[in-house]
Design a protein with these regions (language model features):
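Extended terminal and domain-junction accessory segments
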Residues: 1-6, 82-218, 238, 259-265, ...
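Short strand-edge motifs at loop-to-beta-strand transitions and within beta-strands
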Residues: 40, 88, 96-100, 244, ...
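Short beta-strand elements of extracellular/lumenal beta-sandwich folds
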Residues: 46-53, 205-211
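Short solvent-exposed strand-capping/beta-turn motif centered on an Asx-Ser/Thr pair
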Residues: 55-60, 212-216
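Short acidic, flexible loop segments centered on an aromatic residue
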Residues: 56-73, 222-228
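Solvent-exposed beta-strand/loop surfaces of large extracellular or lumenal domains
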Residues: 67-94, 231-245
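Substrate-recognition/cap regions that form aromatic- and gly/pro-loop-enriched pockets
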Residues: 196, 218-226, 234-236, 247, ...
Length: 298
């Protein structure tokens, strides 16, 4: 994905480089439980404006969303409004959600909306059809084209429409992503769950978490029970999007901020299933919470 600062839009950026396979490889990708051999067809009207909500429900795979000849406006990240931003290619990490507004051309046609797997030549998607009965073009689930890795290109351009009130942090928690260690272990701050050492917060605090990722791949980091704002990427502060899942790419650093206003014990983990079950997990615990029932080994 590339950003054109003149046209102010996202599009494909093509690069030559060494192919790096992910540590888990699939044989197919699905959109609404269907492959591109028989994709879902959504009938629309010429000139109509539609909203498409994308949900990355995969256990592992991140995606590039490809609108083809159409252009969309990104309106929401993880259900939180952002200043609208245009493009034909968008990034979507595991557990994230994106809401796009797309206006169909006045000329009837068939318009595939594709989701390409990260570091993969597999794809899936749905089809918008404004020409009833028009023959579907062939859409191969697997191609000769491979994609690269997700990065900060998209989040660097996004601005929250309802940002957090300006406030200094009361509590800063460093989180160094760790792995892969022997026996396919992944962790946080060189520790591998289960252990009983939560990230402590107090009611009403402005909390910041500072992520660094020296691992060879990106990690979608998800905090339960809270929405946070991305406030810094690679040392550059900004008023970024509100989210509940942030993708921290290989070699990347970012800072998130949230207000601790939901007392309890909340899971915090990489949303790649194979990573959090191998140790990239902990909990955020309020000092006021009852921890007697929390059993990390269970």
């Amino acid at each position: 994905q590339g950003w054109d600062p003149v046209k102010e839009r996202f599009s494909w950026k093509r690069e030559a480089g060494q192919l790096m396979l992910p540590d888990v490889v699939y044989d197919a990708l699905l959109a609404n439980d269907r492959s591109l051999d028989a994709p879902q067809i959504i009938d629309v009207k010429p000139g109509e404006t539609v909203a498409i909500r994308w949900i990355a429900a995969s256990a592992f795979m991140n995606f590039f969303l490809d609108l083809g000849e159409l252009e969309g406006e990104l309106l929401r990240t993880d259900a939180n409004p952002v200043e609208p931003i245009r493009g034909s290619v968008f990034q979507l990490a595991v557990a994230q959600r994106l809401s796009l507004r797309i206006r169909l051309p006045d000329t009837p046609g068939v318009f595939p909306l594709l989701a390409w797997g990260e570091q993969s030549n597999l794809r899936c998607g749905v089809v918008l059809r404004s020409a009833p009965g028009q023959t579907m073009p062939p859409l191969a689930p697997q191609t000769e084209q491979w994609t690269g890795q997700l990065d900060f290109t998209q989040d660097q351009q996004l601005r929250a429409r309802r940002p957090l009130p300006s406030k200094a942090a009361d509590n800063t928690i460093p989180v160094a992503l760790t792995g892969p260690a022997p026996s396919y272990r992944w962790g946080l701050n060189d520790r591998f769950y289960p252990y009983r050492d939560p990230y402590w917060v107090e009611d009403g605090q402005r909390v910041e978490m500072l992520f660094s990722n020296p691992t060879p791949m990106g990690h979608p980091m998800h905090l339960h029970g809270h929405e946070f704002q991305v406030v810094e990427i690679d040392g550059q502060p900004f008023s970024g999007p509100m989210r509940d899942t942030v993708l921290v790419p290989k070699g990347g650093r970012c800072r998130i901020a949230f207000d601790a206003i939901h007392p309890g014990i909340w899971a915090f983990h990489c949303h790649i299933s194979y990573h959090h079950i191998r140790g990239m997990f902990n909990v955020l615990a309020y000092r006021s919470a009852d921890l007697s029932w929390w059993d990390p080994s269970g």
